[in-house]
Structures are given as C-alpha cells and as structure tokens.
Amino acid sequence: MDHHSKAKELLQQRDELDGKIKELMLVLETNNSTMDSPLLDAEGYPLNTIDVYAVRHARHDLICLRNDRAALTEKIVVEMENENKEVSGQTATSEEKPVHRTSNEPFVKISSVVELSPADIGGFRKDDLIIQYGNLHHGNFNDMQEVAQITKQSEDKIIRVTVIRENRPVRLEICPKKWSGPGLLGCNIVPISGANV
C-alpha cells in the first residue's frame, strides 16, 4: 500500500474515532458533566441527578479514544510527509507543505484548555509548549497577532501544530471552529514570556 492510500485509510479510522468521541461527549453534556466534575455529593453518595455509571464509563472511553486519536494523527503526518518526499515537481498545497523550523525552541504555550472545546478535542493540553503553529515557529514568530490571524483564517480547516509535552514532540491537528464557548479554539495561548494576550 502506498503512502497516499495508507494516509487515507488512517484518516478514515480517525473519522470513526471522532464519531465515537462525539457520542461520548454527548453523554457528558446530557449529564451536565465534564471530565473531572464531581460524581458524589457532600456526603459521599452518588449524585442522583446524573447517570454516574454512564459518566464514568464515558470518561474512561474518552481518555482511551483520545490517546488512540493522537497516535493515529502521528501516523497520518508521517505518511503524508513520506508521500510529499516521493512526489517530485509537484507543488504541495499550503496545508500539506512541511514547515522547516530553524529550531525546536517553543515560542508560545497553552495556559488553559476548556473541556470539550475544539482545542481539547484536537489534543491540546495545559502547559503544552508550541514549537510550530501552522507556518509559525520560533524563527519567524513576532507577536500573538500572528497566532490569532492564522487561527481566524483557518476556521473549519486543519492547522498542523507541534508541541513539546513531557520533553518530547507531539504532532497535533487542530481545527478552529465555532462551538458553544467563546472563540474558535477554547484555549488560552500565551507567549513563553508569560504575558497574557
């Protein structure tokens, strides 16, 4: 199987995972719950306003599926990069063209992520250090307006992001979109200097 076919197959698998994740998120929303909201009352008894078993089961499955999705995304990126290497003389689209970073030095970080937001679904985690955001990296980054501009221009499109998490690079695909919360991502991105914008 060539790299293009393999990437297409992996994308289909990820779409199936996204469908399952959406169903599990609906279970949490129906029960007015999040990934870490309390399931017990002040006296230690299960809350009678939610389906405690369903919420616990959904949380467990969401953790597993998100890990599976992250692993699939890593494989997809590798296959697409290998495909680009094999195709000579063909102009890659702006979304497919690999960005050549001058270093792996982070320039912004994630200070908070709202649960069930596009950022959360895409795999952003609090304290992730971003070394690539679309075509932005430490070597060409000037200010946070560039991050905001890329996000706005990429509504309902994929932004390829590489973060440092637990001292290793993790590749993600983030899709900014309108959702029930504010903004298109549902996370707070700040400069490494710590100045919030």
Curated annotation (Swiss-Prot):
Superkingdom in the source lineage: Eukaryota
Gene3D superfamilies per record: 2.30.42.10, 6.10.140.1710
GO cellular component, as recorded: cytoplasm; nucleus
Domain PDZ: 75-166
BP GO terms, sorted: proteasome regulatory particle assembly
Pfam families tied to this protein: Nas2_N, PDZ_6
Keywords: Chaperone
Database matches in InterPro entries: Nas2_N, PDZ_6, PDZ_sf, PSMD9
Family: Belongs to the proteasome subunit p27 family.
Role description: Acts as a chaperone during the assembly of the 26S proteasome, specifically of the base subcomplex of the 19S regulatory complex (RC).
Name the UniProt record assigns to this protein: Probable 26S proteasome non-ATPase regulatory subunit 9
Organism of origin: Caenorhabditis elegans
Gene: psmd-9
